[in-house]
UniProtKB/Swiss-Prot annotation:
Catalyzes the reversible phosphorylation of UMP to UDP. It comes from Pseudomonas aeruginosa (strain ATCC 15692 / DSM 22644 / CIP 104116 / JCM 14847 / LMG 12228 / 1C / PRS 101 / PAO1). UMP binds at G60, D80, T141, G142, N143, P144, F145, F146, T147, T148. This is Uridylate kinase. Its main location: cytoplasm.
Length: 245
């Protein structure tokens, strides 16, 4: 297996992988499914094994949804801060899964949590990535009103990643929700402006504009498809690629 992996040369040297918090739920209705964590750790480990540097951002929707409580009257800033804490919890769980698979990992938080995580520091993050560690960026940007998608794009730009890989439940971007519309058609490739003009809802406006302004390629793919992540990194055409026209 190791020989097979080493024979496949990576197309990307450094990636930023964005996972939704919901992805960690698996078949559960809430929280974290350990089986999903272990499978994701294994797939990330395959990338590390062929020399790819992996930055990781995980959402917090499996543990906390601020939007619902905001609609019920909770202060938006308070809700966003609670959501940031949920991403830290997911980051700690993922670090544990990676380390149990003998993959070195570091959790960095945009909010200072002495004794729990390292505080986010770009130069330190890049040193650890260069040393073969998976770096998990948690607590979003550290500011309310910014999504974890925006945080993922921001961190990717800061650490000079080659691509943002957004893991979803479907194998790319479609003209409509393929779960609701059987006639929905998949896009193989899009430009940032097409995503914005068609209002495709791939990521929020801030995230897409960040990628467009800094020319950061973005690929949307299905993390539930075994081997999809590795296939992308060695040059396969999984999902939908979003880049400059």
């Amino acid at each position: 297996m190791a020989q097979q992996l080493s024979a496949r040369q990576p197309r990307y040297k450094r990636i930023l992988l964005k996972l939704s918090g919901e992805a960690l739920m698996g078949s559960e209705e809430f929280g974290i499914d350990p089986k999903v964590l272990d499978r994701m750790a294994l797939e990330i480990g395959q990338l590390v094994g062929i020399g790819v540097q992996v930055g990781l951002v995980i959402g917090g929707g499996n543990l906390f949804r601020g939007a619902a409580l905001s609609a019920a009257g909770m202060d938006r800033v308070t809700g966003d801060h609670m959501g940031m804490l949920a991403t830290v919890m997911n980051g700690l769980a993922m670090r544990d899964a990676l380390e149990r698979s003998n993959i070195p990992a570091l959790v960095m938080s945009a909010i200072s949590m002495v004794g729990v995580t390292d505080h986010y520091d770009r130069r330190k993050a890049m040193r650890h990535l260069g040393g073969g560690e998976v770096v998990i960026f948690s607590a979003g940007t550290g500011n309310p009103f910014f999504t974890t998608d925006s945080a993922a794009c921001l961190r990717a730009i800061e650490i000079d990643a080659d691509v943002v890989l957004k893991a979803t439940k479907v194998d790319g971007v479609y003209t409509a929700d393929p779960f609701k519309d059987p006639n929905a058609e998949k896009f193989e490739r899009l430009t940032y402006d097409e995503v914005l003009d068609r209002k495709l809802g791939v990521m929020d406006l801030t995230a897409i504009c960040l990628c467009r302004d800094q020319n950061m390629p973005l690929r949307v793919f299905n993390m539930n498809k075994p081997g999809a992540l590795l296939n992308i990194v060695v040059g396969g055409a999984e999902g939908t690629l979003i880049e400059e026209g």
